[in-house]
A protein has these predicted regions:
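Aromatic-rich juxtamembrane segments at the membrane interface
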Residues: 10, 200-332, 337-338, 556, ...
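Membrane-interface helix/helix-cap signal primarily in integral membrane proteins
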Residues: 83-275, 590-594, 603, 638-640, ...
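Metallo-beta-lactamase
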Residues: 604-615, 624, 638, 738-742
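Active-site HxH/HxHxD metal-binding segment of metal-dependent hydrolases
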Residues: 614-652, 759
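Cap/insert and terminal regions of metallo-dependent hydrolase folds
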Residues: 632, 716-797
């Protein structure tokens, strides 16, 4: 059996994922079910062994050892199952152990109830100077009576920490006054999951340094040299390169993207060439491989060159921050040199499996890190189907090899990118074909800057100019690709079923290619058939991962902090009602935009603004700045002529959309949803007072969105309901779901107003620990008296209402992978 380590790794990864994602009772059932299947196979093998001649035809097709072909196949399958089950057992054991340990650590810290500032002592593991901050990992942490099992990641501002370059060296013990926070999971779909991210780094809690109290003990000389050399390299790059160029060089050579401008980083990601910014095997092959060959020529022998070269690449991996991609590359290149020294054949897939087991055995949560998944998936694509196709189809020309490798890398990375970034660069493969030939020259120019910058300015400036030309070309080609139609396809976050369907499609596609290899076809004809198989598989795969239309109706009450934000969807129709916050300053970029992308929404059919306060429009302003397509922007008629509404109208026009000022009595239909304005004080210029009050209905489900209307507006609305046949009377008597006005303020939601409707549930959107006292206890108590179920955000996360087959369900919105 070939590559047993690869099979064991597959089982190991499966076991860890099940252990970390599923509830303990569920994953145990999966594990025991797999064990029962394995045991059944062993029993069947034992009792059917005597009769295999009759059932398997052993007398007809025997190998040299006397075994039939079917019997050998059976044994191989049994062996594969055994390796997978063994790996799964080990992976699930480590996964459960890691999850339980981190959960216990969190519980201990949460129960300790430390103050806003704590005195922390521990030993510095690593220090990295980022763009405007320091990142310090502290191990062996003790806070008062509590000793932590896991490291703490602290952040600080260099200018505020006196003599930090000497006091915070790795190995030194420190006493620090800092805040301490447990990392939190995302509150809304698509948001960054800080809890999962820090767990992938082996960290449970973070903090911000207030003061560096004391530092003592000896540092680690090797790490001191690494840190000082990293700072020297950073200074040299800043000295000889333009600001944008130096930031890219720091990412490529030093493994630090924090200095890059957000627009530049987003351009590389959206274009599909962000992998150039990660320290990978290509870096180590060029740098470490060059040194290895030089050592082979100078000192001779595989062993000495391998030891010295291995020491260098390990040091370089530490130098770049020991990220998953860098460690993977270090382990694989060391395997390559070890194989050369032993005179054995190097197998990249087995080396990849060894690297995965080494990293995941130390920290199972690393499996969820986007960098880890992208790095390992890319190498899997190159070493697996890419090399197989090159070998089987006898592809000899280098440009053809690059095309095949690029194609398979994009195929394998598609579901990974869709899961983490909710989008896919449609022209990424072609762009990589145009930029990859210059990567080596870019790296060599950066290395020359570092080598000559200290003593030969002319050479460093020349190298910087060469690199500048390449980077200008990269920026230009990326800009051109982004202007092409459909350059970035919004995929949304695919579900597990979609990903499995994608894997099945490509499994069938590879099987079809293997079948094609067995046919006696001439080279050109075979290539045409292979191209047809690939094109069909690509089209079907894209279709499977495309966003699914909503079945029935879905309302998402976002946790936007102190503000409002609701997303309504039915079929392929998407409506945003408000979208702002007074305490989340980057609501648009960190919450609203990721949420829409994760749902596969690239355009909004309609955006409705109840009124122009910042806590209702800040995120929407960001979307308009980004020129997100919004077909119709609805504004309250009472705000016409106001500065903020004029700004919204202008931005909507620049984005290519229409604006409509809604009056009382207006009705708008969008898909199967209908919106009726039942109250709007057109003559009132005070924003809260002229809030749009919308009755929204989908089939038999009726909802009321109230903006920030107060009790006086509620009283006026109630008077209108006394008029027989009025729209107010007609709509309020059917309302089942309420968006509580003004975040649950005591100045809204009067008992008479709540009692006028047959309410079943209400959403209250507010910020945790807000200074306004929202929601008012009087409001929540009144809802309890009237048997109205209310669902609060308040930092606890988004809520989702689903209406399918006339059944209404309200539940917590699904996020990504649960951390516990």
């Amino acid at each position: 059996m070939k590559r047993p380590l690869v099979v064991i790794t597959a089982g190991f990864v499966l076991g860890e994922v099940l252990a970390l994602c599923l509830q303990e009772t569920v994953y145990r059932k999966c594990f025991w079910f797999a064990g029962a299947l394995f045991l059944a196979a062993l029993i069947a093998r034992h009792f059917l062994g005597k009769d295999q001649d009759r059932y398997l035809g052993r007398d007809q097709n025997r190998d040299l050892a006397g075994n039939s072909g079917r019997s050998v196949t059976y044994r191989i399958l049994l062996l594969i199952f055994m390796f997978i089950f063994s790996g799964m057992a080990a992976g699930s054991f480590l996964g459960v152990q890691s999850r339980n340990q981190m959960d216990r650590e969190e519980d201990r810290i949460a129960q300790a109830e430390f103050g806003d500032v704590v005195q922390l002592t521990g030993q510095v593991m690593d220090v990295r100077e980022k763009s405007e901050k320091l990142e310090i990992i502290v191990n062996k942490v003790k806070i008062q009576w509590l000793t932590l099992q896991f490291p703490v990641q602290l952040y600080g501002v260099p200018g505020e920490l006196e003599n930090w370059e000497e006091s915070l060296l790795p190995g030194k013990k420190v006493k620090i006054a800092c805040s301490l926070n447990l990392a939190e999971s995302e509150k809304n779909p698509g948001e960054f999951n800080a809890k999962l991210y820090y767990r992938s780094k082996g960290v449970v809690c973070t903090g911000y340094i207030k003061a560096l109290k004391e530092s003592w003990g000896a540092d680690r000389p090797f790490m001191r040299v690494i840190l000082r050399f990293r700072k020297y390299c950073s200074r040299i790059l800043e000295q000889y390169c333009e600001k944008e160029d130096s930031s890219i060089y720091k990412a490529v050579l030093l493994g630090d993207t924090s200095f890059m401008e957000a627009d530049t980083l987003d351009l590389y990601r959206s274009s599909g060439i962000a992998h150039l910014l990660a320290v990978s095997g290509q870096h180590l092959s060029l740098i470490g491989g060059g040194i290895y060959l030089l050592l082979r020529k100078t000192i001779g022998g595989f062993k000495a060159a391998g030891i010295l070269g291995g020491s260098f690449v390990i040091s370089y991996g530490i130098f770049t921050g020991s990220g998953g991609s860098a460690v993977r590359a270090v382990l694989m290149i060391c395997c390559l040199w070890l194989a050369a020294e032993r005179g054995r054949t190097y197998d990249s897939l087995s080396a990849l499996g060894f690297a995965a087991l080494s990293l995941l055995g130390k920290n199972p949560y690393l499996i969820f890190h986007s960098g880890f998944q992208l790095s390992f998936s890319a190498v899997l694509a190159i070493s697996g189907p890419g090399q197989w196709m090159i070998r089987e189809f006898n592809i000899g020309k280098n440009w053809k090899k690059i095309v095949v490798i690029s194609l398979w890398v994009q195929i394998i990375l598609l579901p990974v990118m869709a899961w983490h970034y909710y989008q896919y660069p449609l022209y990424g493969m072609f762009l990589n074909f145009l930029v990859l030939p210059f990567v080596a020259f870019l790296m060599l120019s950066g290395i020359m800057i570092l080598l000559t910058g200290g003593f030969w300015p002319f050479a460093a400036e020349t190298a910087a100019n060469v690199g500048h030309v390449i980077l200008v070309y990269y920026k230009w080609i990326c800009g051109c690709s982004m202007k092409l139609p459909g350059a970035v396809r919004i995929t949304g976050r695919p579900g597990p079923g979609q990903i499995m369907g994608y894997i099945v499609v490509w499994g069938i596609g590879i099987a079809a290619l293997k079948w094609l290899m067995g046919r006696k076809l001439k080279g050109q004809r075979r290539a045409v058939f292979a191209a047809v198989v690939l094109i069909i598989s690509v089209l079907i795969g894209f279709t499977i991962l495309s966003p699914r239309p909503v079945k029935g109706f879905e309302l998402l009450c976002l946790d936007v902090g102190q503000g409002d934000g609701f997303l309504l969807r039915s079929g392929r129709t998407s409506i945003l009602i408000d979208g702002g916050s007074s305490d989340k300053k980057k609501l648009g970029s960190r919450t609203l935009e990721p949420c829409l992308k994760s749902k596969g929404i690239s355009r909004l059919d309609m955006a409705i603004v109840s009124h122009g306060d910042n806590d209702h429009i800040s995120g929407l302003l960001y979307l308009l700045e980004q020129k997100m397509p919004i077909d119709i922007l609805i504004l309250p008629a009472g705000g016409k002529g106001g500065d903020i509404y004029g700004k919204l109208e202008q931005m909507q026009a620049e984005a290519g959309g229409r604006t409509y000022y809604m009056h009382q009595g207006d009705r708008i239909k969008a898909g199967e949803m209908e919106f009726t304005c039942i109250f709007e004080k057109e003559t009132e210029k005070e924003r809260n007072a002229h809030s749009l009050v919308l009755c929204t209905h989908y089939k038999d489900l009726h909802m009321l969105f109230t903006g920030d209307m107060g009790i006086s507006e509620e009283t006026e609305l109630l008077k209108m309901t006394e008029i027989k046949g009025s729209i107010q009377q007609e709509h309020l008597k059917h309302v089942q779901i309420l968006k509580t006005a003004h975040h649950g303020s005591k100045g809204s939601s009067s008992p008479g107003f709540l009692g006028k409707m047959p309410l079943k549930a209400a959403f209250i959107s507010y910020g945790k620990d807000n200074s306004y006292g929202h929601p008012s206890p009087a409001v929540t108590e009144q809802m309890k008296k009237q048997n109205i179920s209310f669902y609060e955000t308040g930092g606890n996360g988004a809520w989702i209402l689903e209406n399918k087959d006339r059944k209404v369900i309200i539940k917590r919105a699904k996020t990504s992978v649960p951390a516990n």
